[in-house]
Structure formats: structure tokens, C-alpha cells
Amino acid sequence: MGEKSENCGVPEDLLNGLKVTDTQEAECAGPPVPDPKNQHSQSKLLRDDEAHLQEDQGEEECFHDCSASFEEEPGADKVENKSNEDVNSSELDEEYLIELEKNMSDEEKQKRREESTRLKEEGNEQFKKGDYIEAESSYSRALEMCPSCFQKERSILFSNRAAARMKQDKKEMAINDCSKAIQLNPSYIRAILRRAELYEKTDKLDEALEDYKSILEKDPSIHQAREACMRLPKQIEERNERLKEEMLGKLKDLGNLVLRPFGLSTENFQIKQDSSTGSYSINFVQNPNNNR
């Protein structure tokens, strides 16, 4: 892991506020905004995982102490003057940000980085208080301010905004943010874990399983990922069987509609499955009622 700043006391305290699951977020944030839906199973799993992720967390949620002062530079007002409503209603135009940075000096980029850090910490405080809409807005403004060359910082901001959006039940937007965070930092375990949970909540079980497998490849000690890799294959199989039955039912209804003018129905066709191969065969029966 990279170097950790000793002066990152406040962001270090915020780690639990930005945990992947609601239980440990509640432990950090205190009484406000409990979420009983996810408390029943996640706390034990993540207590086992916390020790293994501790080093990763310190680096991911804190990117250096910075000066709070920020002098306005040319072109910055184009980003800063956007309303909070615009920030939250539309996604960032990455190409625009890259174009904006082309003529920036290193000093200007560093100032924008420092301002994005201030906005990130502001969002962290809002998240801890349960002000998730405000936190999302702060992370969005931080993303607009943070130069694209600081990929690690931007990956953290995307992951943090995903957490704020999760709290508002904006699951698809949160998945999109997690994907952007992972694209910028493929080893970002927390973002992968967060996306895996979101995939489960949106019934995208195959995608969730792939993310959990990816986590185990990076760190086999993550208990939540191990448990999911044992649990999800059976759930996926059961879902596929259910979908197959629904599909066959619809095909039967369609078949009856087509065969009815000929005095036939799907009862005239018996479907048998070969237990050894799993394949199906169809046999025509002239008088199906006589075979019962």
C-alpha cells in the first residue's frame, strides 16, 4: 500500500462511516438513520473482513492533508457555478474536464486537487450525519474539481458518491459510480465489494458472483466474498430453473393458440427430459387423455 499521512485523523475516523454495509456505517455515524434491512447478517461478516481491509481503507479514504485555502483560477468558475441540482441531475462530462485541464499549470491542478479534498471531507461529514443528498452533492462537486490525472483520488470520490447514492436507493447510479471507481483503480476492493452488493440487490446475481470471485482473487481472506461464492451458485441455478419453467409456460400458451384451429393442443405433445444429458425430446400423442 502507499504511504499514509499521519495527519489524516479526521478521514481515518470516517472510514467506518463509508463502510460497504449499513451496520458498520451506523456504528460510526451513531444513532441517526439506522437501516434495519441489512443489519441481520452483514455485521458478523464484515467484522471478520475488517482486519484484512484496514490497510486498504486508510489509503483509500484519505488522500493527504491539504491547505483549506483555495485561490480561484481561470476557468474554475465554469465548474463551480453549476448548481447542486445540475450536479446531481447529470453525470460528469469527463471529456470536458480533460479539455479544461489541458492548459492548466501543475500549480493550478494541485490547487484544484486540494479543493476537491476539502469538498470530499465536507461530504464525509455530511454522510456521517445522515445528510446523504448533501453528501452526494459534495462528492459530485469534488469530482468536478479534481483533475483527471489524480486517478486514485477520483476513484475514491466515485466510491464515496456510490455510498451516498446507495443510501438514497439510487442503485443503478451507485453501480455506475462503483464501475467508474473500479475502472480508475482495478484493485479497489471496497468499490468491488460495494458493487457486488448492489448487483445482488438488483437481482444481477451473475454479475455479483463475478465481482465476489474477483475479490477472492485479490484477497482470499475476505469472508463476505467467500460466503457469497458458496451461496450464489445455488441461487443462480434456482433462478434459472424458475425462468425456464416460466418460459415453457409461455411457449405452451402460444402453442395452444396456434394449434387450436387444428383441433390440437400442447397436450398432444409430450415433452420428456433425458436424465443423463438434460436434453428434451417431444413425442406426438393422438389421444392424450387415453394415456392418463
Curated annotation (Swiss-Prot):
Keywords attached to this entry: Phosphoprotein, Repeat, TPR repeat
MF GO annotations: unfolded protein binding
Gene3D superfamilies on file: Tetratricopeptide repeat domain (1.25.40.10)
Biased composition (Basic and acidic residues): 45-55, 75-85, 99-125
TPR repeat feature ranges: 116-149, 155-188, 189-222
Highest rank taxon of the organism: Eukaryota
A Pfam cross-reference name: TPR_1
Assembly and oligomerization: Interacts with the GAP domain of NF1. Interacts (via TPR repeats) with HSP90AA1 and HSPA8.
Protein name: Tetratricopeptide repeat protein 1
